[in-house]
Amino acid sequence: MPRSLKKGPFVDQHLFVKVANENEKGTKNVIKTWSRRSMIIPDMLGHTIAVHDGRKHIPVFVTESMVGHKLGEFALTRTFRGHVKDDRKGKRR
């Protein structure tokens, strides 16, 4: 169920302060965060945010199409290495 519109988007306070400081200075430094639950807001456009995936920080460049999504959606936590090939035909001969 989506968040109520009257509440507005959720952004962790420490992340919001870091983005506001970068906007105020006019710089585009990488912002490191562990807050995967924070929603991407228009103030974050053009910034690179390093989102933690449980092991390392994945740099995510925020574009206009990402607004309204959560940061964790763009830093995958599981690595898929592919299925093992089933080689039954070779074993019969």
Curated annotation (Swiss-Prot):
Belongs to the universal ribosomal protein uS19 family. This is Small ribosomal subunit protein uS19. The lineage of its organism: Bacteria, Bacillati, Actinomycetota, Actinomycetes, Micrococcales. GO terms for biological process: ribosomal small subunit assembly; translation. HAMAP family: Ribosomal_uS19 (MF_00531). Keywords: Ribonucleoprotein, Ribosomal protein, RNA-binding, rRNA-binding. Protein S19 forms a complex with S13 that binds strongly to the 16S ribosomal RNA. NCBIfam families: rpsS_bact (TIGR01050). GO terms for cellular component: cytoplasm; small ribosomal subunit. The gene is rpsS. Pfam families: Ribosomal_S19. One of its GO terms (molecular function) is rRNA binding. The keyword Ribosomal protein applies.
